[in-house]
Amino acid sequence: MHSTEVQAKPLFSWKALGWALLYFWFFSTLLQAIIYISGYSGTNGIRDSLLFSSLWLIPVFLFPKRIKIIAAVIGVVLWAASLAALCYYVIYGQEFSQSVLFVMFETNTNEASEYLSQYFSLKIVLIALAYTAVAVLLWTRLRPVYIPKPWRYVVSFALLYGLILHPIAMNTFIKKQAV
């Protein structure tokens, strides 16, 4: 007897897309939302964090079966950077900036150990643990986002073009501004 099983193509899931968006948005948008709610900034930071965090969907769309690995690698980097920024905000009440990086690289080991002894607290540890727990929870909810083959490339390119390439092209070639 000859068996002719037809393997069903995986279907697109709005729920899977929603979890992927929430996961990638979490790392940059949480701090921006806190800054907005506290009244220190407008909505531009939230808008930019939502838009540019969506770029992390490109590898997820191109390689849907590897979403957990891709999200874990990207997530660890985003988690470390965003946790540092969140802790800085909790300690100083302002956003992390380039001038902070300059000061950090000019710091010697004595100053660094003094800083850690002054600002390392239970509050920071609890915030870091809660932040990490939410990130892990969101990661466990991730499922492959299947977009049919020709469209996954179109959608990925549209994201890249709309968020990166078009603004660069407009500023460089039309407005004649430096990048």
What does each of the following model-derived ranges do?
Residues 2-178:
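Transmembrane and membrane-interface helices of multi-pass
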